[in-house]
Regions:
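A short, hydrophobic beta-strand element of the alpha/beta-hydrolase
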Residues: 204, 231-233
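Gly/Ala-rich beta-loop-alpha elbow adjacent to hydrolase catalytic centers
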Residues: 206-210
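Bacterial N-terminal signal peptides
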Residues: 2-11
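Substrate-access "cap/lid" subdomains that shape
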Residues: 88-90, 98, 183, 190, ...
Length: 558
């Protein structure tokens, strides 16, 4: 772990874990006491919030299961954000290895027994950090204790190679990031009452990769009883085959083996890495983290480049989401309607022209961008929401609520957004965090009265769900439970008023594929090129991939 900052100041007033449990009010003193020692907080007077930042919840050796943190003697200074876990971001390696810390934010009130929201950041399980949503304003909006978690990423958070399987069955799963998340939830169970949270009312939520992690925990025996409700923001059901993943990892690491003179060719190196012996494990564990962090950095939401969430048979069942056994809790699924737009804007085919603005001056380029954005977005929307619910149908007993955010798609209301990104991947965050970390994208599009009312209601739904597992109350448009009638909540706004209503989304991937086939805005050749190079292999594109895989098999047979 990274260095832990301590304060030598003696604690005059503390609130022990035991005393908080029996107290009727929360002790707002500067220092609290958790299982591992005293901890000093920060006060955000502007947002009326209390923060404990960079708090270590676990320690771990490389590719081993996390363990509880050692107790400390002095007072831990939790007034500064902790280091993020090592990652390759913006073409450079940042962060430190095994930075297993979390942030806690709560309203600056004396209330206790507050709902707890544990949040997992996005970033393809390769990048990102706990400050994706800081919680300073959100904790008060939801009247909850907000916990945001840093966990291991990339090839250090997931690694399926046999040579590393020297521990328990859970440790041998290769799903180290999931083990970190489980450990964070254990920490919450043991310590959250100290911060006025209710350990028996915990909601696990995540965005993007974090949302996919949440979905994976629903079928994981490791997470049984660790939380009470779940929210997946833009996160569908994605898992990886363990043997296929080993091949991909060995191929990715092979150049380092050759560079270090252990094998003469990359093919030899790959075959060597697929063996199971201590020499390989020792080599991998002694590699610099700076050399491992950039691996598979070009994944672009493709599991075929960076496979993770392995169906190992212990942490994740071999049958994946076909299992009959779930951690059956109330579930909320939230998606935008143009989920693929951000990824298209950064795709090598479009990125330069998108950033310069040339794309929007070229009719052909604009048509190619629109085709990829629109159909990719529709497939992605289904994957995040109704398609996930359909896979659970008949096996999952708890209530499922699905919302689809349309705000950003109407050129009469949000002209800049509608012409570029629309209701993009993560647009919900603009409703939850002030100031928004998407300010460069949204400009002033959320400053009108309609967007403000929409955002207020969205937070009210979340607040209700955290409290009871039901997002509804008498002051809100009824959010229907999803069923085989495909009921969802449509969320949008005009400039002057919110536009929130119950709706039906019965569309299927087959319907979208038929639209793509019938689309005449581009030639068949260009469409095929976009389908196979831009849209294929993504988290959401399995229905499209099946078509081209079948065509390739037919060509081989002929």
């Amino acid at each position: 772990m990274g260095l832990i900052a301590f304060s030598a100041v003696l604690t005059l007033t503390t609130c022990s874990h035991k005393s908080t449990e029996s107290a009727d009010t929360f002790n707002q003193s500067t220092t609290q006491t958790i299982e591992t020692g005293n901890i000093k907080r920060k006060k955000d007077t502007e947002n009326n919030a209390l923060e404990w930042l960079g708090v270590p919840y676990a320690q771990a050796e490389r590719w081993q299961a996390p363990k509880e943190v050692d107790k400390w003697d002095d007072t831990f200074d939790a007034t500064e954000y902790g280091e993020k876990d090592i990652q390759f971001s913006n073409n450079e390696v940042v962060g430190s290895e095994n930075e297993l810390n979390l942030d806690i934010v709560r309203p600056d009130t004396d209330e206790t027994d507050l709902p707890v929201l544990v949040f997992l950041h996005g970033g393809n399980n390769q990048t990102g950090h706990a400050q994706e949503i800081k919680g300073n304003t959100l904790a008060n909006d939801l009247n909850a204790v907000y916990v945001s978690v840093n966990y291991r990423l990339g090839a250090l958070g997931f690694n399926p190679l046999d040579a590393l399987k020297t521990g328990s069955d859970e440790e041998n799963s290769g799903n180290f990031a999931l083990l970190d998340i489980a450990q964070a939830l254990d920490w919450v169970e043991k310590n959250i009452e100290t911060f006025g949270g209710n350990k028996d009312n915990v909601t696990l939520a995540g965005f993007s990769a974090g949302g996919r992690d949440v979905m994976a925990t629903l079928i994981s025996p490791t997470f049984k009883g660790k939380y009470d409700k779940a929210i997946s923001f833009s996160g569908g059901m994605t898992l990886s085959d363990e043997e296929e993943s080993q091949e991909i990892f060995a191929t990715a690491i092979a150049p380092l083996v050759v560079e270090d003179g252990l094998q003469p060719t990359e093919e030899d190196a790959k075959n060597w890495l697929l063996e199971d012996n201590n020499e390989i494990a020792d080599y991998l564990k002694n590699l610099s983290a700076d050399r491992l962090a950039p691996f598979m950095g070009n994944a672009g939401i493709r599991l075929s480049v960076f496979p993770h969430l392995y169906k190992d048979g212990t942490v994740i069942p071999e049958e994946g989401f076909e299992t009959e056994t779930f951690n059956d809790v109330p579930l909320m699924l939230v998606t935008g309607t143009n989920e693929f737009s951000l990824f298209i804007a950064s795709d090598e085919r479009f990125a330069e022209d998108f950033n310069s603005g040339d794309l929007f001056q070229d009719e052909q380029k604009q048509a190619e961008f629109d085709y990829s954005r629109n159909y990719g977005g529709q497939l992605y929307r289904l994957s995040n929401g109704v398609d996930s619910a359909r896979k659970l149908a008949g096996k999952y007993n708890s209530d499922i609520y699905i919302s689809e955010i349309f705000y950003g798609d109407d050129s009469n209301v949000t002209p800049q957004l509608a012409s570029t990104l629309g209701a993009f991947h993560g647009i919900f965050k603009a409703m939850l965090q002030t100031p928004s970390n998407y300010a460069a994208f949204i400009g002033e599009e959320f400053d009108n009265d309609g967007a403000k009312d929409m955002s207020s209601d969205f937070k009210a739904y979340l607040k209700n769900f955290l409290a009871s597992g039901n997002p509804n109350d008498k002051n809100l448009v009824n959010w229907p439970k999803w069923s085989e009638q495909s009921k969802v909540l449509s969320i949008s706004a005009t400039e002057n008023a919110k536009d929130i209503k119950a709706a039906t989304d019965s569309e299927t991937a087959s319907d979208i594929l038929e639209k793509m086939q019938a689309d005449t805005t581009l030639s068949e050749g260009v469409k095929n090129e976009l389908n196979t190079t831009v849209l294929s292999g993504r988290w959401f594109s399995a229905p499209l991939d099946e078509i081209y895989s079948s065509q390739e098999e037919q060509v081989v047979k002929n």
